[in-house]
């Protein structure tokens, strides 16, 4: 069982209240602390993905726990962020070698996603990656999510 310590449970009250009972019943606990990473168990949440719903759950958790205090967020940008993160994590899960299925690679992908205001046809490395995936596997979850992200981004 994985517990995410976040702004909703900053003191870990759920872990404190339920942790021992879960351990006694054979559960293994993993703590992912998005407030203080030094107190986190330093595990890789991407290695616990088995299907699409796991990707969606992880993205929801990341977005919920990394939003600033009192920030409601514009639904348009929230949707675009959700689609982008979902597509990138799905790509890593389904297409990348196991050793690249981690947050470091996810951040590298995000960092290469520059845009060119002068050239509408410019494609960054991630665009090219997904263009290739769409040709090889047009029905892949990752390719479909990225296409939706690009459609949403094109609206702005």
What are these regions (language model features)?
Residues 77, 82, 86-156:
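Non-catalytic, charge-rich alpha-helical accessory subdomains
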Residues 1-91:
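Switch/coupling segment of Walker-type NTPase motor domains
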């Amino acid at each position: 069982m994985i517990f995410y310590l976040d702004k909703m449970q900053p003191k870990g009250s759920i872990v404190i209240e339920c942790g021992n009972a879960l351990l006694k019943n054979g559960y293994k606990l993993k703590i992912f602390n998005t407030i203080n990473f030094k107190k986190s168990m330093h595990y890789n949440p991407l290695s616990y993905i088995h299907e699409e719903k796991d990707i969606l759950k992880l993205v929801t958790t990341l977005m919920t726990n990394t939003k600033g205090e009192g920030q409601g967020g514009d639904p348009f940008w929230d949707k675009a962020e959700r689609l982008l993160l979902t597509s990138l994590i799905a790509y890593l899960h389904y297409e990348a070698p196991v050793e690249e299925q981690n947050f470091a690679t996810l951040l590298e992908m995000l960092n290469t996603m520059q845009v060119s205001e002068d050239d509408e046809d410019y494609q960054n490395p991630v665009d090219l990656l997904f263009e290739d995936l769409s040709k090889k596997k047009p029905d892949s979850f990752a390719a479909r999510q990225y296409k939706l992200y690009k459609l949403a981004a094109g609206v702005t």
